[in-house]
Design a protein with these regions (language model features):
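A generic structural signal for short hydrophobic patches within well-formed alpha-helices
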Residues: 120-121
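Conserved non-catalytic scaffold segment of RNase H-like nuclease domains
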Residues: 1-112, 125-140
Length: 140
């Protein structure tokens, strides 16, 4: 069984206000084990990255100025994820941003099965604090 662990970084929190994807990272799993196959790319955007977002991911407009736009990596991304299940922490956020980028390109929304690890972590840990930084510290 093939699954893809996926994460994005963005210019801000609201795609409806024009925020965009600036980084995508994917890791392939077969039967829940990493194969070592990954896909990672940065995206140039004209939108200014929010200061709060920079504090989270450290990516700046200056760094991204030499990167291609999402459009140039979209097919490579879709070929990598295929129709396999996507494992995403706080999936609504990432999926909405990805679908927004795909929509800008005239492509259909993702149809992949989505496994959201955020509610799983909250249930397992019996805690509202379950962002990725916390989980990484908790599980080393």
């Amino acid at each position: 069984m093939r699954e893809i662990v996926l994460d994005t970084e963005t210019t801000g929190l609201n795609f409806k206000s024009g925020d965009r994807i600036i980084e995508v990272g994917c890791v392939e799993l077969i039967n829940h084990i990493s194969t070592g196959k990954t896909l990672q790319f940065y995206c140039y955007v004209e939108k200014k990255i929010d200061d709060g977002a920079i504090k989270v991911h450290g990516l700046t407009n200056e760094f991204l100025s030499s990167q291609p736009p999402f459009e140039e990596s979209a097919e490579k991304f879709l070929d990598f994820i295929k129709d396999d299940a996507l494992i995403i922490h706080n999936a609504d956020f990432d999926v909405n941003f990805i679908n927004n980028e795909l929509g800008i390109l005239g492509k259909p929304n993702l149809k992949n099965k989505i496994i959201d690890t955020l509610p799983l972590a909250r249930k397992k840990l019996n805690s509202r604090i379950s962002n990725l930084d916390y989980l990484c510290r908790r599980f080393s």
